[in-house]
Design a protein with these regions (language model features):
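Active-site bordering "gate/hinge" segments
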Residues: 1-228
Length: 228
């Protein structure tokens, strides 16, 4: 990645940019949903791209592409410079950046124990199915819906001041819903766990007690159904 960002930096500065920054990002997103404890939808997709931003004569210029290569980085740098020159007559204020500390060759990884993408699809399905089945076995619960989304973001940043960083973070979001249908119509009650900056360990009970919350949902749902 450094070869790609270096190509953009050198090309843009050579074309007259007073400031250049490059961002290369890969985002992998997995999604799994179950209906009544049975698999309904599953996807695993990756987005990859590069963005080049420049300042030329006090004006911003920007260009991006899903193709990450040295050749593309050079083309984007020239496009960004051309855009800055084009937008200069329309700029009402001259851009001036505040000096920032330089972080050369630094890296950061968010704290997590289990990469969700290292967990087998079967294990993920089993966990959601187990929680869903507990709800389905409860009185008054006719259907369940469960879904989890897990994301891994990897970013590389470099600028003409000398900063070059990489970072990786993982997050998981899961929601399980109990549904009641009948003469009363349709009512539902879901888990309250928020999106979290954890790995798949989030789906155990050590951080958020999923099993305990699942045990409470049927009672809460029944109270909601009975409410006037």
């Amino acid at each position: 990645l450094e070869k790609v960002s270096d190509a953009a930096l050198s090309t843009a500065t050579g074309a007259g940019a007073s400031h250049v920054d490059v961002r290369i990002e890969r985002t992998r997103t997995g999604l799994l949903s179950l209906r009544d404890a049975k698999p309904e939808t599953q996807s695993d997709e990756t987005n990859f791209g590069i963005g080049v931003r420049v300042i030329v004569n006090g004006a911003w210029g920007f260009a991006s592409s899903p193709d990450v290569s040295v050749e593309t980085a050079q083309k984007l740098a020239l496009t960004a410079v051309a855009m800055a020159k084009t937008s200069k007559p329309l700029s009402t204020d001259e851009i001036s950046l505040v000096p920032e500390p330089v972080y050369a060759k630094k890296s950061w990884v968010s704290a997590y124990e289990i990469d969700p993408f290292s967990v087998t699809d079967a294990d993920k399905k089993d966990r959601l199915a187990s929680l869903s089945s507990k709800l389905l076995a409860a009185k008054g619960v006719n259907h369940t819906s469960a879904h989890t989304m897990y994301v891994k973001e990897q970013k590389h940043y470099a600028d003409s001041a000398g900063t070059s960083t990489t970072q990786q973070r993982v997050r998981v979001q899961t929601q399980i819903e109990a549904i009641s249908t009948g003469d009363h119509g349709f009512e539902s009650m879901r888990t309250l766990a928020q999106p979290a900056g954890y790995g798949w360990e989030w789906m155990g009970n050590s951080i958020w007690n999923w099993d305990a919350e699942i045990e409470q949902l049927p009672t809460l749902l029944a109270e909601k159904v009975a409410a006037p």
